[in-house]
Amino acid sequence: MSILELLPAIDIKNGKSVRLKQAQLDSAQQHESPSVVLSDFVAKGAKWVHLVYLDAAFKSGSNSDLVQNLIAASPIKVQLSGGIMNEDSLQKALSTKADRINIATAALQNIDWVVKAIKSNNERLTIGLDIDDGVLVARGSGEVIGDPFEYIKILDMAGCKRYVVTDNSTDGELNGPNLDLLEKVLKSTKSMIIASGGVSKLSDLKDLRRMGLDGVIVGKALYVGAIDISAAIKTCYQ
């Protein structure tokens, strides 16, 4: 069985590590400083971290220096996400030297630019697919973008290698991932899939690994102690 890449999440807002429910900023619950959280993940054996710059995603402030410094100091690989939806924000993200950049679902409103970005930076880009009730929605605003499978066809043709698929209704809820949705996405593309949202127990990770996904982003379950990160690493890699 292939490994399942584990990406523990750090969401940053106002310089603090926070967690959201269903991608809503007003649900933010504050935790420790991002650097402390990152150090803990590293000490326990994490190979990747999923770093979400919420201030950029929700246009609620700026902590770009903090994000830059975290990435520069990280001894493990970083996937950066948050507000990356045009050329300016993409270039700023690329300049951080993050190993992977996740383009926001909202960027798909300018699909021509996304296609161009994929062709220019394919090895470092993933495309976020935030899905609510079967349709793509822009995180935060909830603005409907369209049918995810129609967009996947376009993005596959452009050469997209990896998607981050989030069922917004499960994000931060600890009710388990939407396996049916993930299975449909897997069948629609040959690109790699990273699951996000809902993971609450080790058996969820086992299910996702059996499906053949490339990776999984885990946030709240780690922060509230529902999953021990050391056990999660063992489940995903051994």
Each language-model region and where it sits:
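Structural preference for beta-strand elements that scaffold enzyme active sites
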Residues: E5-A9, W48, K77-Q79, R100-N102, ...
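N-terminal beta-alpha supersecondary unit
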Residues: S17-G61
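Short, acidic/polar
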Residues: Q30-F41, N86-Q91, E143-I154, L205
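Charged helix-capping and loop-helix junction motifs
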Residues: G61-Q68, S141-E150, N175-E183
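Catalytic cores of alpha/beta
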Residues: S74, V78-R100, D180-G215
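Glycine-rich phosphate-binding active-site loops on the catalytic face of alpha/beta enzymes
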Residues: K92-W113, S169, G197-K201, M211-A231
